[in-house]
Regions:
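Alpha-helical transmembrane anchor segments
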Residues: 2-26, 166-236
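Short alpha-helical interface patches
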Residues: 3, 63-64, 123, 195
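Membrane-interface starts of transmembrane alpha-helices
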Residues: 25-31, 118-121
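Juxtamembrane/interface alpha-helical elements of multi-pass membrane proteins
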Residues: 28-111, 126, 226-236
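Inter-domain helical "communication" segments and dimerization helices
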Residues: 44-49, 90, 101-110, 114-123, ...
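Short, structured helix-loop boundary elements
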Residues: 54, 58, 118-121, 139
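Hydrophobic alpha-helical segments characteristic of transmembrane helices
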Residues: 64-85, 121-159, 166, 223-224
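Flexible domain-boundary/linker segments
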Residues: 98-99, 125, 129, 158-162, ...
Length: 236
């Protein structure tokens, strides 16, 4: 989160600097900067961190299920399947792998239920139990599960791509708004400063920066809304 912290603080300082230019008031500059910085560290940072952790966890689960089943169908070995499926970058998952060193594969799969509390993982463990009891082609047994895993993964990727496009649109919209305000401040300075002496106009400037923060919060909540619920199932 260090990179995100730096970006957010820089953005807060830039917005605070804009507030100084358009209000010609150092106290407004300091106030706006502090409000934006506090918002990030009190609310936004937690929202972003939760979103990132949830995204990593569900994608880690989907990768594990898909890789395990495909490897099992090729090598017909639970140990090899687990080893290949465990090669992901989820740090919390890797910590669990360390804790499960003395367990056999079946015990490991059962232990992971505590971490992967998703319906797809519970279905996965049932598929493995059925395969061990009855044998057969594991890919045929798990066909519907694999299709669902692919569908969830594709939906999450599409949602992430769509959110990034909306983020670009959001940034451009507010950037243009700030540029218009700065244009009035510097290109029409005489007219602008005469308006700035008006208390209602000065108050509107402060409201403007507060509205910007509110719109940022609303966008952030929408941006970090995952297309899956707590069970790992697609919404709707």
């Amino acid at each position: 989160m260090k990179k995100m912290d730096l970006v957010s603080i820089t953005m807060s300082l830039v917005i605070g600097l804009i507030a100084f230019f358009v209000s010609n008031n150092i106290f407004v500059c300091i106030g706006v900067t502090l409000i934006y910085v506090l918002y990030y560290f009190v609310l936004a940072r937690k929202i972003i961190k939760t979103y990132n952790l949830k995204t990593i966890k569900i994608k880690s689960c989907l990768y594990f299920i898909n890789t395990f089943l495909i490897t099992l169908s090729i090598k017909d070995s639970l140990e090899d399947a687990f080893e290949h499926a465990s090669n992901n970058t989820d740090k919390e998952f890797q910590q669990l792998i360390y804790e499960m060193q003395e367990m056999n594969v079946n015990e490991k799969l059962d232990y992971l239920k505590k971490y992967y509390s998703y319906s797809s993982y519970r279905m996965f463990t049932k598929v493995i139990s059925l395969y061990l009891d009855q044998g057969g082609n594991v890919l045929k047994i798990s066909e519907s599960l694999l299709n669902e895993v692919v569908r969830i993964d594709e939906t999450m990727n599409e949602s992430e791509s769509s959110s990034k496009k909306k983020l670009v649109e959001f940034v451009i919209l507010w950037l243009l708004t700030f540029l218009v305000l700065l244009f009035m401040r510097f290109a029409l300075s005489e007219f602008y400063f005469s308006m700035l002496k008006s208390i209602p106009f000065f108050a509107l400037l402060i409201v403007f920066f507060l509205l910007c923060l509110v719109s940022l919060h609303i966008f952030l909540k929408r941006f970090t809304k995952l297309p899956v619920n707590e069970e790992g199932e697609l919404n709707g």
